[in-house]
């Protein structure tokens, strides 16, 4: 991703087809040591392609991917388990209420 970001920075800055040394110099300004193989791979993949068209195609593909997870619903038939769970929750709430009343707010630094 960092290689692509450097490539995009260079193209936005006016370089029509950034070279490997251009990308490496951008990355070195922020303290990243570039891997020559990855830079060459990126350049070969993007060579001769219009960046705006690639971004538009990527946005179109991303729009088809669901971004929010579906809400998980429990399976039907768990009434007995639900009753036990609610009883356990009530017991926890009672314990929490008892604990908070014990020190009357003055036991913080005792």
From Swiss-Prot:
Matches recorded under CDD domains: Ribosomal_P2 (cd05833)
Subcellular location: Cytoplasm
Superkingdom field: Eukaryota
UniProt feature, compositional bias: Low complexity: 73-88
Alphabetized GO MF terms: structural constituent of ribosome
A biological process term (GO) from this entry: cytoplasmic translational elongation
InterPro entries assigned to the protein according to its UniProt record, in alphabetical order: P1/P2_N_sf (IPR038716), Ribosomal_P1/P2 (IPR027534), Ribosomal_P1/P2_euk (IPR001859), Ribosomal_P2 (IPR044076)
Keywords: Cytoplasm, Phosphoprotein, Ribonucleoprotein, Ribosomal protein
Region annotation (Disordered) ranges: 73-110
Acidic residues compositional bias, start-end: 91-104
UniProt keyword annotation of Phosphoprotein present: yes
Presence of the UniProt keyword Transcription in the record: no
GO cellular component: cytosol; cytosolic large ribosomal subunit
UniProt modified residues of type Phosphoserine: 100
Family statement: Belongs to the eukaryotic ribosomal protein P1/P2 family.
PANTHER family referenced in this protein's UniProt entry, alphabetically: 60S ACIDIC RIBOSOMAL PROTEIN FAMILY MEMBER, LARGE RIBOSOMAL SUBUNIT PROTEIN P2A
SUBUNIT field: Component of the large ribosomal subunit (LSU). Mature yeast ribosomes consist of a small (40S) and a large (60S) subunit. The 40S small subunit contains 1 molecule of ribosomal RNA (18S rRNA) and at least 33 different proteins. The large 60S subunit contains 3 rRNA molecules (25S, 5.8S and 5S rRNA) and at least 46 different proteins. The acidic ribosomal P-proteins form the stalk structure of the 60S subunit. They are organized as a pentameric complex in which uL10/P0 interacts with 2 heterodimers of P1 and P2 proteins.
Miscellaneous notes: Yeasts contain 4 individual small ribosomal A proteins (RPA) which can be classified into two couples of similar but not identical sequences. Each couple is distinctly related to one of the two A proteins present in multicellular organisms.
Record's function text: Component of the ribosome, a large ribonucleoprotein complex responsible for the synthesis of proteins in the cell. The small ribosomal subunit (SSU) binds messenger RNAs (mRNAs) and translates the encoded message by selecting cognate aminoacyl-transfer RNA (tRNA) molecules. The large subunit (LSU) contains the ribosomal catalytic site termed the peptidyl transferase center (PTC), which catalyzes the formation of peptide bonds, thereby polymerizing the amino acids delivered by tRNAs into a polypeptide chain.
The protein's name: Large ribosomal subunit protein P2B
Gene designation per UniProt: rpp202
